[in-house]
Each structure stands twice: as structure tokens, then as C-alpha cells.
């Protein structure tokens, strides 16, 4: 549930602002419950488990791709919602595989619901206090990958062989290096002045490199612009 809220926050503020954009992630999330509790699942959680590493890698890389046309918007939505779907399918499948006998089902479903509440509370209440941007999204993507059955197996010990673990670690390190490089480049060029996060998302005031402008931006939407050189009476340029 935490990843559901984080994904919804990211796509509705940093990719596109559109009515009912919260619906596709919710549909994908609920669909995973329908699939894993079915007698004959349409998609095997094991298949989702095998694809999860690549889905998380694609989602992390998309975090630093600028949204400049409708094709990027559509691609971003597909990748982020797809990563949510595969992560939820893998982890929910692991829960169902550990479902106890009838005598323990009440406790099982109660704890599952409690986990959903705690995940939602972390994203909705705690993350806005801890982070000034939607940093919980990549953190929860990584957590979903590390908690997947492919990494943890049936117990808490890692069950990967050395070769698979090395390849996976190398891919994650490469993702981290590329992501960090893009983040540093953006930090050097975006001229960030103030970043604040509240109930309605992240608001940022910055000065683009090489331009005599100060911009106010919410998500990927620019809400105002002023010329910096007019110190006596800055002229509003846009809203």
C-alpha cells in the first residue's frame, strides 16, 4: 500500500496532472489481489518475481528522464504502474503462499490489513515530514525488490547463488551510479533556491541556468515566473 501511494504521488505530480490519474495504479494494485487469490492465477507471481529487477531498474531510470512530450508521459506511466503491478503481484503472491490453515486466517488477514495501514501511514504522514521530495518512492521500490521471494526465499536468509547475487548487485550499483550522476547534473543546472513539501505535493522555486528568471514549480507544472533583474518591481510572466 505504501508503494501504491508513492507511485500515485509521483505520477500525478512529476509526470502528468490529469483527472482520475490515481485510478490506474489502484486498479493495478487491486488486480494483484484478484490474481494471487484465484485458484488458477492468470499471471504467476513467480513470473512477476523474475521480471521485478528489470521493472525496478526501468522505474528508477525513468525518475531522471525529463517529461517533455506526450510519448514520455505515456512511457513513464506504463513503466511506473508496471513496476507497481509486478512488485505487488510478487509480494502478495508470497503472502498467499504462506497463508495458514483456516484456524489462523483471521490473524493472517488482520496482519495483512495492518501492514497496509502502516505502509499508507508512512507515505501519507511520515514521509512528508522526513523528505522534501517524493524520495519514499525509490526507497519503497528498492525495499520491494529486496523483500521479494527471489531475494529472500521462504525464510529471512538470502537464497541467491553467488553468480545471481553478483549480477543483481552489479545492476543495482549501475542504476545507482547513473541515477546519482543525473541527480548531480540536475542539482548543478536547475538553480534550486527553495523546495517545500506539503499536503498537495512538492513546490520548488529555482532559477534555470543561463536564464534571468525565477520560476515556481509544483511537480512538473510551472505556476509563475519573474525576471530577476527587475529588482524594483518584478514583472509576472506566467501562471
Question: How should these model regions be labeled?
Answer:
Residues 1-239:
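Alpha-helical transmembrane segments of multi-pass membrane proteins
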Amino acid at each position: 500500500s505504501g508503494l501504491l501511494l508513492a507511485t500515485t504521488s509521483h505520477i500525478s505530480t512529476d509526470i502528468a496532472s490529469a483527472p482520475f490519474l490515481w485510478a490506474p495504479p489502484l486498479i493495478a494494485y487491486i488486480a494483484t489481489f484478484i490474481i494471487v487469490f484465484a485458484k488458477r492465477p492468470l499471471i504467476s507471481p513467480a513470473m512477476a518475481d523474475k521480471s521485478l529487477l528489470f521493472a525496478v531498474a526501468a522505474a528508477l531510470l525513468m525518475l531522471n528522464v525529463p517529461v517533455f512530450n506526450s510519448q514520455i508521459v505515456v512511457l513513464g506511466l506504463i513503466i511506473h504502474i508496471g513496476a507497481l503491478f509486478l512488485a505487488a503481484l510478487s509480494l502478495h503472491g508470497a503472502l498467499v503462499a504462506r497463508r495458514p490453515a483456516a484456524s489462523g486466517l483471521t490473524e493472517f488477514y488482520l496482519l495483512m490489513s495492518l501492514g497496509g495501514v502502516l505502509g499508507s501511514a508512512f507515505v501519507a504522514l511520515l514521509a512528508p515530514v522526513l523528505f522534501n521530495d517524493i524520495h519514499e518512492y525509490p526507497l519503497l521500490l528498492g525495499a520491494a525488490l529486496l523483500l521479494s521471494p527471489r531475494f529472500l526465499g521462504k525464510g529471512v536468509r538470502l537464497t541467491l547463488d553467488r553468480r545471481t547475487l553478483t549480477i543483481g548487485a552489479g545492476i543495482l550499483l549501475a542504476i545507482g551510479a547513473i541515477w546519482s550522476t543525473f541527480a548531480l547534473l540536475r542539482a548543478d543546472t536547475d538553480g534550486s533556491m527553495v523546495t517545500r513539501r506539503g499536503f498537495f505535493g512538492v513546490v520548488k522555486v529555482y532559477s534555470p541556468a543561463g536564464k534571468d528568471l525565477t520560476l515556481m514549480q509544483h511537480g512538473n507544472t510551472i505556476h509563475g515566473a519573474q525576471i530577476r533583474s527587475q529588482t524594483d518591481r518584478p514583472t509576472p510572466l506566467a501562471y
